[in-house]
UniProtKB/Swiss-Prot annotation:
Gene that specifies this protein: MB
Compartment list: Cytoplasm, Sarcoplasm
Protein name (database record): Myoglobin
Residues given in the record as nitrite binding sites: H65
Residues involved in heme b binding: H94
Swiss-Prot/TrEMBL GO biological process terms: removal of superoxide radicals
GO function terms (MF aspect): heme binding; metal ion binding; nitrite reductase activity; oxygen binding; oxygen carrier activity; peroxidase activity
Binding-site positions, O2: H65
Signal sequence, start to end: none
Length: 154
């Protein structure tokens, strides 16, 4: 399940492009998540009133949260799988406070892939997409294992 050094390099290269506009990418990821899986919106008290895409695009809070999400994910990706210290508090909050099911992490992973395909087609070919998919799957599997340790059946 682990990624090769070359795969990690592909992931981090495209992630550098994300960091060039992390707020824009984060906003787009959350909009795709909420439009594709409206049930996920119910987990966000701050955003559940946003029903239309233009309302979502106008929300500074949504953009700010997208930045938070992708900044945290970027920190985890940069650890190249050695992310236990970064993952523990994230799993704790998402299991005990936010109660985010692993399925929703799959949904946001799909949204991340879609946004990267849309914004960076020249830099997100099959090899890079495959590497990113593996990295996100590793992240989800490790979160799921932490959830289990915490007794959360997410």
């Amino acid at each position: 399940m682990g990624l090769s050094d070359g795969e990690w390099q592909l992931v981090l290269n495209v992630w550098g492009k994300v960091e060039g506009d992390i707020g824009g990418h984060g906003q787009e990821v959350l909009i795709r998540l909420f439009k594709g899986h409206p049930e996920t919106l119910e987990k966000f008290d701050k955003f559940k009133h946003l029903k239309a895409e233009d309302e979502m695009r106008a929300s500074e809070d949504l953009k700010k949260h997208g930045t938070t999400v992708l900044t945290a994910l970027g920190g985890i990706l940069k650890k190249k799988g050695q992310h236990a210290a970064e993952l523990a508090p994230l799993a704790q909050s998402h299991a005990t406070k936010h109660k985010i099911p692993v399925k929703y992490l799959e949904f946001i992973s799909e949204a991340i892939i879609q946004v990267l395909q849309s914004k960076h087609p020249a830099d997100f070919g099959a090899d890079t997409q495959g590497a990113m998919s593996k990295a996100l799957e590793l992240f989800r599997n490790d979160i799921a294992a932490k959830y289990k340790e915490l007794g959360f059946q997410g």
